Amino acid sequence: MRSLLETLEALKAPLPAGYVVYRQQGGQQIPYIPWWRVAELLDYHCPSWEWSVTSIQTCGQYLVLTGRLTLHTADSSISREATGCELLDCDSYGDPVSNAEAMAFRRAAAKFGLGRSLYDKAARPASARPVQGMR
């Protein structure tokens, strides 16, 4: 089992090729990591990680889910919480709960450094590019 420092350094490393996928949003291709790839990286770097949903609420037309990601390392355990949301009447892939949970899970992992560069708009101009044929 790695120390906390070693685990955090490993999670901040560049993402393996093929782990980043793109989805269309607002005329741009937005990079993201699917939740199962996040779980795969956590399994590799910190196999004793733990995820729990701490609350599910509705707010107007949205379902808001809060989850807690805990990393258990050789010298400590540390948790980060994050939220995810989805329209209650979503017409995208999945359902509101699983979509919101996937978002919360990815965001909690990003708080540990995993894929954080995808959230840095200044560092991703080559990644977030306009969709072909759209303005």
Can you say where each PLM-predicted feature lies in the sequence?
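Positively charged, aromatic-enriched nucleic acid-contacting surfaces
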Residues: R2, I33-G133
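Long, charged low-complexity interaction segments
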Residues: A10, M134-R135
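N-terminal, Lys/Arg- and Ser/Thr-rich interaction peptides
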Residues: M1-Q29
